[in-house]
Amino acid sequence: MAWDMCSQDSVWSDIECAALVGEDQPLCPDLPELDLSELDVNDLDTDSFLGGLKWCSDQSEIISNQYNNEPANIFEKIDEENEANLLAVLTETLDSLPVDEDGLPSFDALTDGAVTTDNEASPSSMPDGTPPPQEAEEPSLLKKLLLAPANTQLSYNECSGLSTQNHAANHTHRIRTNPAIVKTENSWSNKAKSICQQQKPQRRPCSELLKYLTTNDDPPHTKPTENRNSSRDKCASKKKSHTQPQSQHAQAKPTTLSLPLTPESPNDPKGSPFENKTIERTLSVELSGTAGLTPPTTPPHKANQDNPFKASPKLKPSCKTVVPPPTKRARYSECSGTQGSHSTKKGPEQSELYAQLSKSSGLSRGHEERKTKRPSLRLFGDHDYCQSLNSKTDILINISQELQDSRQLDFKDASCDWQGHICSSTDSGQCYLRETLEASKQVSPCSTRKQLQDQEIRAELNKHFGHPCQAVFDDKSDKTSELRDGDFSNEQFSKLPVFINSGLAMDGLFDDSEDESDKLSYPWDGTQPYSLFDVSPSCSSFNSPCRDSVSPPKSLFSQRPQRMRSRSRSFSRHRSCSRSPYSRSRSRSPGSRSSSRSCYYYESSHYRHRTHRNSPLYVRSRSRSPYSRRPRYDSYEAYEHERLKRDEYRKEHEKRESERAKQRERQKQKAIEERRVIYVGKIRPDTTRTELRDRFEVFGEIEECTVNLRDDGDSYGFITYRYTCDAFAALENGYTLRRSNETDFELYFCGRKQFFKSNYADLDTNSDDFDPASTKSKYDSLDFDSLLKEAQRSLRR
């Protein structure tokens, strides 16, 4: 049993009912219903029943494998007479009592659909006489039986295959449920079984069941041998001819039931809350060998699993007709529904994959259309993803440059009163300024808004603080500087190559404008900076005899540092001292035309270095360094206080160092007393402390190792172990560390006592007989007269 969907907005007729029953029987809407409330759940063989439950068409292969061991002719043993009698009984239940709505839940997650009216004409037949099937949506049998209350009585109707068209056309409101009951034969005991099912015609496809849509290459008009399993179809097709029902009925297999589930009743109005909320669940049930009819209380699988492959609910794929072959493997043929009085046949076969791809392709086309409408980005200069600027940007760049030129001409008019031609050019520049402003407003009012705001900010700054060039310098120096700017700024900077900074946008960097100085401007005056274009070949009329000289005049070297120093608010006297005398003499010489560019660039670099050293920023930074000058004190008391602090700190430092030395000495003395110090004598003169430590570390952990070298080659060392036992081990076994080219080590305990002599001369043996008075001279007891007589007596001798 497979899940099928219908793509056309036609009425689901009762063809499916006829296909499920397997016979062309007339519809009898006024027969009594069957009551199954007396059935016991324990009578149901749950193992065989649940084993026959299959949820989708991908399980059809498993279903077919369950009956591979059955005889080939097991379905041919069906008694045709018993089948006809049972079908006659089943035709007695049509359009009886509706299902209680309180026992059925409302499914909010389902998609909406159209409402079928009686204006829809019955579908026309195919050329071979076979009418195409209509749309069908069927809920699951298990879901219906689980959700219905225990005391709810189900109504049963029988559907006829020949009267379905008229029955569909006679509906005056939305098509309601047509319950049906189908009989099946037990393959082993020929025991008749009947299953209660309700068929609810639905017009809207359920998005949850789209993954069960499959296609088949079989045409809508199938062979009689394939139509013998039509009782298992959900969206069934009519019989190819009226002479085939007996042969198909004779070849019928154990019935597979389809039970649609819906909360609606035939008396519901069109505005019912369940009108736009439907569900389609179909359960394939094999009832062979079951003992009862009562379904299980729990489904074998989760009924509302999310379908990761479901397509859009708005997509309506074609209705599929399931025709199982004799091997019971599900095969499906695609048939197209018709509406009105004309028949329309689908061209290519459509499946869930086809619908999904169609939807994704539509989304991708919309995405590509949005991509094509994306504006071009403004990127930076020398990258491979750069895009060329459009014409509007070029127009705005030219307008901004012309505004810069007009501002410079206006400033020249204010600073240079004696130049009449500059005044006239200023007037024309102002007129052109108004024209360009109007043109810029017409071209792009949104993009020129920022430029106009910058002009207003500059005007306010110049109004309150004055022009930056007039901040420090006097009027005369400003006139000279601006005159030099006007003479060679345009001509010189046009000769320079275009320097592209990676951090600058592409606005204006690739233009061939004459005034390159306007490319980089200060925030409020629009003048060129010193950092990027500081030197260039120039033509000056002040210091050179010829106007077209290529040599660097002094105005060239003085202009940029002046502008830089004006920003740093230095004094005007730095201007004269910052000029290079060598460049001045070169520029005044008649032979300056033949000066080489290499010498010129050397002078330029040398000049820049000197300018940097003479700049106020450089001098200020040197003067503020802590090592450039001595500290100054306000008074002598402050100096004395600082000196006392330094002396106190020095004394504290010396005291700490002496304490550390005493601590180390005490530790050494303690190690000597603990017998942890070993004296190692007669070591090689080239022995290092690391080597001696590595060789004696085999006996234990060493805290300290020292080596003392002598000029006579008698070198020695001291090794302090952490533990006394390690020192004893080194003293006893240290001789084993001697190499073949070395003498035996002298190993002793303690520190420096081995250098003391053990035998001393006793100089104090007669100390007891010593009289301090005997050491006194004889002259000490004589007076002056005695001493005089003694002296005279010595002279006579």
Curated annotation (Swiss-Prot):
Residues 349-797 are annotated as: Mediates interaction with RNF34. Keywords: Acetylation, Activator, Biological rhythms, Nucleus, Phosphoprotein, RNA-binding, Transcription, Transcription regulation, Ubl conjugation. Residues 562-577, 621-630 have a biased composition (Basic residues). The modification N6-acetyllysine is found at residues 77, 144, 183, 253, 270, 277, 320, 346, 412, 441, 450, 757, 778. Its main location: nucleus. Residues 101-138, 212-276, 289-376, 543-598, 612-634, 648-668 are annotated as: Disordered. The modification Phosphothreonine is found at residue 177. It is found in: Nucleus; Nucleus, PML body. Residues 676-752 form the RRM domain. Changing residue 538 to A: Abolishes AMPK-mediated phosphorylation. It comes from the Eukaryota. Phosphorylation by AMPK in skeletal muscle increases activation of its own promoter. Phosphorylated by CLK2. Heavily acetylated by KAT2A/GCN5 under conditions of high nutrients, leading to inactivation of PPARGC1A. Deacetylated by SIRT1 in low nutrients/high NAD conditions, leading to its activation. Residues 292-338 are annotated as: Interaction with PPARG. White quadriceps and red tibialis anterior (TA) muscles, liver, kidney and brown adipose tissue (at protein level). Skeletal muscle, brown adipose tissue, heart, kidney and brain. The keyword Glycoprotein does not apply. GO terms for biological process: adipose tissue development; cellular response to oxidative stress; circadian regulation of gene expression; energy homeostasis; gluconeogenesis; mitochondrion organization; negative regulation of neuron apoptotic process; negative regulation of smooth muscle cell proliferation. Pfam families: RRM_1 (PF00076). Residues 114-127, 243-259 have a biased composition (Polar residues). Residues 218-236 have a biased composition (Basic and acidic residues). A motif (LXXLL motif) lies at residues 142-146. The modification Phosphoserine is found at residue 538. Induction: Dramatically induced in brown adipose tissue and skeletal muscle by exposure of animals to cold. Up-regulated in brown adipose tissue of obese leptin-deficient (ob/ob) and leptin-unresponsive (db/db) mice. Leptin is required for normal basal and cold-stimulated expression in brown adipose tissue and hyperleptinemia rapidly up-regulates its expression. Induced in muscle by exercise. Oscillates diurnally in liver and skeletal muscle. Transcriptional coactivator for steroid receptors and nuclear receptors. Greatly increases the transcriptional activity of PPARG and thyroid hormone receptor on the uncoupling protein promoter. Can regulate key mitochondrial genes that contribute to the program of adaptive thermogenesis. Plays an essential role in metabolic reprogramming in response to dietary availability through coordination of the expression of a wide array of genes involved in glucose and fatty acid metabolism. Homooligomer. Interacts with MYBBP1A; inhibits MYBBP1A transcriptional activation. Interacts with PRDM16, LPIN1 and PML. Interacts (via LXXLL motif) with RORA and RORC (via AF-2 motif); activates RORA and RORC transcriptional activation. Interacts with LRPPRC. Interacts with FOXO1. Interacts with NR5A2. PANTHER family: PEROXISOME PROLIFERATOR ACTIVATED RECEPTOR GAMMA COACTIVATOR 1 PGC-1 -RELATED (PTHR15528), PEROXISOME PROLIFERATOR-ACTIVATED RECEPTOR GAMMA COACTIVATOR 1-ALPHA (PTHR15528:SF10). This is Peroxisome proliferator-activated receptor gamma coactivator 1-alpha. It comes from Mus musculus. The gene is Ppargc1a.
